[in-house]
Amino acid sequence: LRTIVWYNIPMKAYKYRIYPTKKQAQTLANTLESCRVLYNCALEQRKIAYKQFGISLNYYHQADELKDLKETFAHYKQLHSQVLQDVLKRADKAFQNFFHRVKLGDKPGYPRFKGKGWYDSFTYPQSGFSLSDNSKGNQRLKLSKIGEVKIKLHRVIKGTIKTCTIKREVDKWYVCFSCEVEPERLPKTNKSVGVDVGLEKFAALSDGTMVENPRYLRKSEAKLKHEQRKLSRKKKGSNSRKKQRTKVAKIHRKVKNQRNDFLHKESCKLVTNYDVIVFEDLRIKNMVKNHRLAKSISDASWSKFVEYATYKAVSAGKEVILVNPRNTSQICSGCGNTVKKSLAARTHKCPCGLVLDRDINAAINILRLGTSPGRATAVAGL
């Protein structure tokens, strides 16, 4: 049986750099700190209410107390009401996810308090922000309670802006607009493809195409270790330690940006060139339990690759299908017989005479599973 997930209204995110003044940057940092404290208080209140009184609080219970919060703690009057509401929604979402994991029998992971520096964004869900040009023709982002901030709109925003999120990444500030957009259909190619993701090669396609694994984290590992060792030698609380921590964070940011750029480009190629894209429905959480492969799997970011391909396919009118990964590498794509092979064996050789790369063999099997009636486990598309 197949489960079909329909996306009626695609959402698209636009991210831009903003350039606050020193005073504005301090206000943004203070806003993040106030949001962090509120988030932690919301978690603590829920914890106490349940332990002492057996009461499960929800978002609405806590949102009703925001007015009293502002009266008691005057600095919260400096924050837009919807920003505060969004903080409580995040806390509520954390508990919803916790209960969902408990229901599924997964490792629950009770919602955690956010330490300093670990709450890096706040959101205006519906109002409190606007875009405009000043008298000199420069672009500005007006934020309620903060003022006009310089922004660089390097590309045109399409669709209707639904939310505005301000995010701090190390020493830089960004804004991310979540927009409701009309699907932009791409021309049909009448082609389907199976995709087998891996570590040796990032991906093998059923048409024989191989995508190299860039291994961005591995390439930066030596430099990262060097800077982390320097960080460990710095005195806690010192300015030199803060500066060194920023250096380490910048390396991580560069790796993250390189990886995301690669994933966007490769997923875009798939959606442009194929109408139907079939992936394995991999359980990444279980796979990273193998400590020898965990870092390489995380560096490859297979889940994010599938996620990017899926939302691009939704907007383009294409289809993404997920199939059971069981034995896709062991079954011969030519005759259907099982040919056992170890991970070290990179070539598929079958008594039927078929000889080809094991990953391409798997990709062909993945395509067959995805396009056979009733064999797919999940489908995403329009």
Where do the model's predicted regions map?
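Short acidic-glycine loop/turn motifs at beta-strand connectors
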Residues: 21, 135, 169-170, 206-209, ...
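Substrate-contacting helices/loops that form the catalytic groove of nucleic-acid
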Residues: 49-73, 158-163, 169-306, 373-382
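Acidic carboxylate diad motif detector
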Residues: 61-167
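Glycine/proline-rich, flexible active-site/cofactor-binding loop segments
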Residues: 119-181, 187, 303-307, 311-315, ...
